[in-house]
Every structure is written in C-alpha cells, then in structure tokens.
Amino acid sequence: VKALVKLKVISKKEALTIQKGLNSILNDNKKGRLKFSKKNEDIHMNVESFLNKKIGNVANKIHTGRSRNDQVATDTRLWTIKASKNLQEEIKNLMKSILNQARGNEKTIIPGFTHLQVAQPVSLAHHLIAYLEMFKRDLNYFDFCINNSDENVLGSAALAGSNYNLDISLLNKSLHFSKSKNNSMDGVSDRDFCMYFLHASSLTATHLSKLSSELILWSSNFMKLFNISSEYSTGSSIMPQKRNPDSLELVRSKTNSIRIKSIELSNIVSNLPLTYFKDFQEDKRIIFDCYDELISCIKIMEKVIKKSNFEKSIGRDLCNNYFATATDLADYLVIEKKIPFRDSYKIIADIVNYAQKKNKNLSQIKIDEYQKFQKSIDKNIYKYVDINNSLLRKKTPMSSNPKDVSRVIKKYIKFLRVR
C-alpha cells in the first residue's frame, strides 16, 4: 500500500481506508467471523472480497503491481522467519533446563557408553553438555534459515517482474527484509528457504529423538540413571508397580514424521520446471505441520528435563561393576612401567577376564593378584582404578575433567544469557 501511494496509484486517504479495512478483516478473523467462499478461489481473492464489502471499490486497487505468486512467496518467507525465531526461543529454554541439570554435577560419575556397553567414566554434566552442543548447532542452523528467508520477493509479480516502478527499498524496510531477490523467476519459484527450515527442523528432531531414547533407556529398571517426573509418565492399566515414560516415547515417535517432511517437499519441488505451480500450495501444509509438531516436542522435552531428576549414586556402581577404568590401568602400565600400549592392553584384558571369573571389580583385586599378570605392578595401580581420578586425569580441553566441564558450563551460561 505504501509503495502504491508513492506511485500515486492510490491516495493517502485511500491508503488509510485500505489499512483500516485490512485491520478490521484481521480482527474478524481472530473472532471467527469470516466466512470464506469457494467462488473466490483462494485466500487472496477472499480477502479482497471481504475488503470490497467493507470499503467499496477502492479495494480493487490493492492488487496493482503484484501477483498472488510473489505475495504468497513473500508471506511464506515472513512466516518462516518468525517460526524459526520461535523455535530458537524454545530450543534455548530447553538448553537452559539441560544446563541447570548439568550445573553442580561436574563430579557426578556415570558410565559413558559405546555400543551400549559401559566404556569409561564420565560426569553427568559432561554427558548433558553433549546435548547442549547439539542444540547449539540447531540454533545456528535456524540462523541460516532466517538469513536465507530474508529476501523480499515483492516486485517479481507473476514471474517477469512488475510494470510499476515499485520502491523496493521502501518495501524491504516496511516488511523488515534486509535484501531483495535478484531474479523474479527465482523469486516466485524458490522454496529452498522452506527446505532449509525443514532440514533444520529435521536435525533438531533427530537430537530430540536421540535424547528421548537415551532417557527412556536410563529410566529402565536395568539402569535407573533417570527418574522421570510422575507428571510426564503414566501407570500401567494392569501392573501397579510400573511407570511408563510415555511423554518421551511420544516425542521420539513424533520426530519421525518431522524428519519425513523435508523429503516430502523435496519430492514436490524437484519435479517442477520454472516458475509457479499449484503444487506450491502443499508447502504451507508441510511447514506448518512441521512447526506445530516440533515446537510441541521441544516444549515437552524441556518440561521433562526440568521436572525430573538424575540418579547420582548408581552411575558409580555401574562403572565399578563393569570395569570402566580398565583403560586407565592400561595407561598406568604405559606411563609408569613404560610398557607399550598394545602389550598393556593385553595384560589388562587378561586381568579383567580374571576379575569376571572371580566375580570381583578392579578395586577388589589384591596387589599379589595383579602381579601374577605383570610383576612390576605396584600399589600405585589403585590410583588408576579410582573412578574420581579417571576424570581428573583427563588432559584435553574437551574432556570430562571437572575443571574443563566447569569452564564449558560457564561458557554456556554466558551464551544463553546474551543470545
């Protein structure tokens, strides 16, 4: 409307009338008063019809210089920017809940797993920070989505551009775009920004599914590392002793449909020559559904993390019972006894096999038993058996050493405060 005023296609008085009419239609829609007609083909023509009834023939001027093609492309870009920012806010809320669980647990021992086998001791905080890293990448991906959606398409018209000398800078400023399209044909046909949105959503969904699966596993009777809040678990209809992590299972299930949506839209747009087709009507359904499902999953996960608790004592027992410091013992032989690592590996493997047969953990094996496998072993080996020392011994900055974990936690506190 502002651009048409500048071109003197409509007067300032007519522009004010049009704006009041459009605001009235918006208010009617919020109150459910609008009755759409199939005779008007689509939402654009329905709105124009509503406006005509409210303000008369001046409504017939608003379509000057534009097409439904460039209008819907612009509207979709504006929606994608807003949706991406909303998702970023919910992801940050989830990250804050994860961070709050990590704080104070820099020295809380849990087993780190590979192949679902107890591998090495880590801290609960270190494990949770891994998810902060994932969700931080998701924030960055949505930044990428916002940047690629931030292109004004108005002026492309149907496909060839507009015959009216529209002030594109004015349009950009009015709609809060930082730039405009260079090519009108690409302007009306480009749905890459929708694909980026779906890809980013798919990646976030993947991380949510991963976290859900892990917490479900941790809440099982076999691990008991995670106690899910009763608000987000349900009882069995027949077995009174059970609590089921239904909320997490539903998040895990719903993330599958989110990930499929990027494939669905890709299949639609890959078959289309330039420029505009009715096929594009489907992109709204896909991205709207994706958004609704993803934001609900993030919100549920945030509440589950916030209101549940992690078991702080069982992790240590799991590490002891499943020889989690075996690698530390191999390093002991390398560092203190100068035995090549591959030879050290074999010696400790034999010791672990011996301990399993004797139903002992590594701290329960006596020094004379250790010396049966390597005579040079002395009492210093017990320093390497100790799980706390395993964390403290880590040297690299990305390690599970409590000092490094605390440093990273401080970084995330600052990151979430300023972002």
Residue ranges with predicted function:
Residues 49, 54-58, 222, 239-419:
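Glycine-rich cofactor/substrate-binding loops
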